[in-house]
UniProtKB/Swiss-Prot annotation:
Extracellular side: 16-551
Functional description taken from the UniProt entry: Binds to sialic acid-containing receptors on the cell surface, bringing about the attachment of the virus particle to the cell. Plays a major role in the determination of host range restriction and virulence. Class I viral fusion protein. Responsible for penetration of the virus into the cell cytoplasm by mediating the fusion of the membrane of the endocytosed virus particle with the endosomal membrane. Low pH in endosomes induce an irreversible conformational change in HA2, releasing the fusion hydrophobic peptide. Several trimers are required to form a competent fusion pore.
Family: Belongs to the influenza viruses hemagglutinin family.
Record-given protein name: Hemagglutinin
Membrane topology: Single-pass type I membrane protein
Topological domain spans for side Cytoplasmic: 573-583
Membrane-crossing segments per the record: 552-572
InterPro entries in the record: Capsid_hemagglutn, Hemagglutn_HA1_a/b_dom_sf, Hemagglutn_influenz_A/B, Hemagglutn_influenz_B
A Pfam family assignment: Hemagglutinin
Location(s) in or outside the cell: Virion membrane; Host apical cell membrane
Keyword Glycosyltransferase on entry: no
Amino acid sequence: MKAIIVLLMVVTSNADRICTGITSSNSPHVVKTATQGEVNVTGVIPLTTTPTKSHFANLKGTKTRGKLCPNCLNCTDLDVALARPKCMGTIPSAKASILHEVKPVTSGCFPIMHDRTKIRQLPNLLRGYENIKLSTRNVINAERAPGGPYIIGTSGSCPNVTNGNGFFATMAWAVPKDNKTATNPLTVEVPYICTKGEDQITVWGFHSDNAIQMVKLYGDSKPQKFTSSANGVTTHYVSQIGGFPNQTEDGGLPQSGRIVVDYMVQKPGKTGTIVYQRGVLLPQKVWCASGRSKVIKGSLPLIGEADCLHEKYGGLNKSKPYYTGEHAKAIGNCPIWVKTPLKLANGTKYRPPAKLLKERGFFGAIAGFLEGGWEGMIAGWHGYTSHGAHGVAVAADLKSTQEAINKITKNLNSLSELEVKNLQRLSGAMDELHNEILELDEKVDDLRADTISSQIELAVLLSNEGIINSEDEHLLALERKLKKMLGPSAVDIGNGCFETKHKCNQTCLDRIAAGTFNAGEFSLPTFDSLNITAASLNDDGLDNHTILLYYSTAASSLAVTLMIAIFIVYMVSRDNVSCSICL
């Protein structure tokens, strides 16, 4: 009997366990799926980040425009857009621009009534073009315009480069020279003079003052009427007579009068018209602008470079496809805003160790990824583990791993394509704006962002569902492959594990991973079949009757012993016999 017990122990100690699985981290992760809700998985790829505020920067790979004219000192962007005498410099080309002035006004030049027109949008309009250039010649001869002759007015509050009286180069202040009388509406045509098919931005306006000054300058104290028309857009104005504060809004020299400034955009070959009375500011030099430059609200100076410029966070370097936090407009290679953090599954469903101990025993629980990962392998790799007297061996199955990587890469690419499409959708409306400020309405933009966020979240849920199902399929395929290779040399004990009838060290496991495994190379003597061999009995003085007597005596004794044991167990179960054991 002792020999049989020893034999059973040897068989047990030589049995190794081989399991299929996926390497993972030491703790489960949670992902959301479309139909299963939250699922614990062995690995994840974070898709979102939460940025922190930083300074604005130059956009990588593009020229970024801060001020319209960096070399124009002490000039606002509106000064540059109106061509104030001391603010006429070169505007560099740029594919991205920073709207850095909250309330653009002129500095120390003739006071403008900003609220009467869309003049504040003029610098923003110019920022929206990649190339901007002021014409070298005037669009009309102001001195000989209808209602003239005129003298061109200047102002001491708008000094030129020699500190003499001056005025904006984009407009001519037409003051009647001799005929200072009231006039009926007059019309002047504004030709297209740009030479390279650019948009022509024509600036014009009118001056108004108190009644005394109106009579002195123009011979008429009544409100004057003005109209501009270009590309089917017509605008009407009536001047205000008097009532202006002495101190100007711009902080310049005290003025009793004000000017109203507007602009019109003329497409190639299109003529504009201006209908006017007294006090008109006739157009002179025009802006010729082409190309597109994306505009975003920000601040100066621009420090360093960044992948993305975000109105709330400044310069960002893109590390993830999506971000959470505060939503706002952004330009460049930017992550897309989503409401909640997103994770993409990178593994199978996680099974806790406690469950495995119950189902597979101690050795089964510690084998494979299910206990928290394999040492020495890259997270997410498919393969096999072997546990036995040799310790733990690990081997990767390259084909299965590559298939899983391809599946996850495909899902990431799909999400990336969705990201690009949504970015194009967001920026498309901005690119189409030509005559308006290049800003999307906040409410419309937020609504669109919410919709896109929901679409992305759904796409991630569906991707997680597909990845988890695909990973499970890969593991099942790996398990079937292992079972086929092991054949009768192993017993399937469930959950992707097999108990082998031979040792399986690192060499054995590498053969399995390579598909060249041969059980015969690693097998020990087995006890799968009962071998019966003939035996010869030698005559040692015992005859056949004596031998039969010994056997019958032993058999009878064994039978009696078993009957007594059965009787005692039966009586104990009926409570007819009590048994006490004392040491």
